[in-house]
């Protein structure tokens, strides 16, 4: 039982293992940068990034948590007096909507950590 407490601590503190999901949140913006803040999602929610376009102007973006049934939808949204067509793209990993390319790394790291913890638990009972 030597590894018991450290493994329990990692399970409690690692969001990918416990099922806790944070997403990046930022309001609608016309800036290419959307640094945002972290927000906690509900069990039935996914992280999303919304990309909006309107004829003759630059794109808009927003991020946050959304009910999984809203993923992939395109809907009109008003921003700064213009109507944009906003498409919601969802992902299900911890902070997966943070930026391009980071979601895959974060998800891979989480899965790798889960595999490592599982192997350590198995070794604990064999030794």
UniProtKB/Swiss-Prot annotation:
GO terms for cellular component: inner acrosomal membrane; outer acrosomal membrane; plasma membrane; side of membrane. Residues 23-97 form the UPAR/Ly6 domain. One of its GO terms (biological process) is cell adhesion. It is found in: Cell membrane; Cytoplasmic vesicle, Secretory vesicle, Acrosome; Cytoplasmic vesicle, Secretory vesicle, Acrosome inner membrane; Cytoplasmic vesicle, Secretory vesicle, Acrosome outer membrane. Keywords: Cell adhesion, Cell membrane, Cytoplasmic vesicle, Disulfide bond, Fertilization, Glycoprotein, GPI-anchor, Lipoprotein, Membrane, Signal. InterPro entries: LY6_UPA_recep-like, Snake_toxin-like_sf, SPACA4/Bouncer. Belongs to the SPACA4/bouncer family. This is Sperm acrosome membrane-associated protein 4. It comes from Mus musculus.
